[in-house]
């Protein structure tokens, strides 16, 4: 993440979350990156309240990069905040992937495709 961005905005913000996810894609030469930044607690940090979290997902496909970011305000213990942020990041990434799938591909799914894993 660009040091100037962090100096200007701090580490807990949407731009940093997207930069982290994009950095993961670039560093790992992948197609999908997920990042979280925030304060899980206990207590606030650097003026940011406990539970304030940003989750981001970045996907590259065919030379196009798509990103999404969400701000969350979560309650609970450190473990609860971290777990909720993780779930939110995965859901955001899932949403990006679903949006990239052609509608005809989604229509051809069978009920077995939708069944939860045991």
Model-derived features: positions:
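Short alpha-helical segments enriched in small residues
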Residues: 1-118
């Amino acid at each position: 993440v660009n040091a100037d961005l962090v100096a200007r905005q701090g580490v807990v913000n949407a731009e940093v979350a997207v930069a982290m996810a994009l950095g993961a894609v670039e560093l790992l030469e992948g197609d999908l990156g997920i990042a979280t930044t925030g304060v899980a607690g206990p207590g606030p940090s650097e003026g940011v309240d406990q539970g304030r979290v940003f989750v981001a997902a970045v996907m590259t496909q065919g030379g196009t990069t798509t990103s999404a970011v969400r701000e969350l305000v979560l309650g609970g213990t450190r473990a609860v905040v971290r777990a909720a942020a993780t779930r939110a990041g995965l859901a955001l990434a899932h949403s990006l992937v679903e949006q990239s799938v052609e509608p005809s591909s989604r229509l051809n799914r069978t009920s077995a495709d939708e069944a939860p894993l045991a």
